[in-house]
């Protein structure tokens, strides 16, 4: 009798209330959710497809297996690693049913154009994208994705040499865009493009970077809607005299800059290179922080709460 009761009780796992299953599955990572749970039974698949589980697809702990190469795209990704990413993306997108609003990738997870396009087409309602590695993504790939993401509000991206093509697409297609984080040096060209294309941006983070002083001055003058600016652990760069090679690192903000930042709701800065570890790392790495050398997860940090992972 006891064995019969136990057998009946175990069989009822498939009848467990969907709401309870969803609460349990909320504790699981995307890797666990795509590991076969949906194939246990129809009830479990229904729970696995609940939109609340897929509001954020977080792949910030998944890295590509790659080697650096001297020519573009400067990385070669192992086939098995690429296949693993494709599998995760396909399963996630199938289960999410287009409900994903936030998509997060590791800074050493190198998507191809095909992977990016596939993902963009299956989650057109994205509002936030964290995509720090663009080595294998071409202009056509990212522009196609931006055209799909009409509701995009926030983007974390690497510093790029030719920003107009991207920021122009954002301006044309993403009317609610308000938040940008740049990982890497911030040049005058980028600042000018930002002012031209996205003058109404509200939040900008360029932490742990080398920032041209002229570029900083331009955004303070040219972004009238800017409310939050984060330059924590960054240093300013100037060039003295007539020789561009004579680079000067500025470790203190002068009166002119402080006066211009006074209008902001929040101005976040730290330039204490003597005692601050992150300031020291930025300077040692010459404004392009080698995140792989440091504690896992450091790259996710941001003093702006809406950008922190």
Swiss-Prot record:
UniProt-listed InterPro entries: F-box-like_dom_sf (IPR036047), F-box_dom (IPR001810), LRR_dom_sf (IPR032675)
One of the protein's GO biological processes: defense response to Gram-negative bacterium
Entry annotated with the keyword Repeat: yes
Domain F-box, residue spans: 10-57
Pfam families: F-box-like
One GO MF term: SCF ubiquitin ligase complex binding
Each LRR repeat, start to end: 77-107, 108-133, 159-184, 208-233
Highest taxon of source: Eukaryota
Keyword line: Leucine-rich repeat, Repeat
PANTHER family: F-BOX DOMAIN CONTAINING PROTEIN, EXPRESSED
Protein name in UniProt: F-box/LRR-repeat protein At3g48880
Organism name: Arabidopsis thaliana
């Amino acid at each position: 009798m006891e064995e019969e009761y136990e057998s009946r009780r175990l069989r009822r796992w498939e009848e467990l209330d969907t709401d309870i299953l969803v609460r349990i599955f909320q504790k699981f990572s995307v890797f666990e959710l795509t590991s076969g749970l949906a194939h246990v039974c129809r009830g479990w698949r229904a729970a696995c497809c609940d939109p609340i589980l897929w509001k954020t697809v977080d792949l910030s702990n998944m890295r590509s297996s790659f080697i650096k190469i001297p020519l573009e795209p400067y990385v070669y990704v192992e086939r098995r690693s690429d296949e693993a990413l494709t599998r995760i993306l396909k399963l996630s997108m199938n289960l999410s049913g287009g409900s994903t609003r936030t998509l997060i990738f590791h800074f050493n997870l190198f998507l191809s154009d095909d992977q990016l396009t596939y993902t963009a087409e299956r989650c057109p309602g994205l509002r936030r994208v964290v995509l720090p590695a663009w080595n294998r993504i071409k202009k056509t790939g990212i522009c196609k994705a931006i055209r799909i993401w009409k509701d995009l509000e926030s983007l974390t991206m690497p510093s790029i040499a030719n920003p107009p093509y991207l920021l122009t697409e954002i301006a044309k297609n993403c009317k609610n865009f308000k938040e940008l984080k740049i990982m890497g040096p911030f040049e005058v060209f980028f600042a000018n493009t930002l002012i031209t294309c996205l003058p109404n941006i509200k939040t900008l983070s360029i932490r742990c970077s080398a920032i041209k002083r002229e570029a900083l001055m331009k955004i303070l003058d040219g972004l009238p809607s800017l409310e939050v600016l984060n330059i924590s652990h960054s240093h300013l760069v100037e060039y003295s005299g007539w020789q561009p090679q004579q680079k000067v690192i500025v470790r203190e903000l002068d009166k002119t800059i402080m006066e211009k930042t006074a209008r902001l709701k929040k101005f976040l800065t730290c330039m204490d290179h003597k005692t601050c570890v992150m300031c020291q790392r930025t300077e040692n790495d010459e404004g392009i922080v080698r995140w792989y050398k440091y504690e896992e997860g450091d790259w996710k940090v941001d003093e702006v709460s809406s950008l922190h992972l």
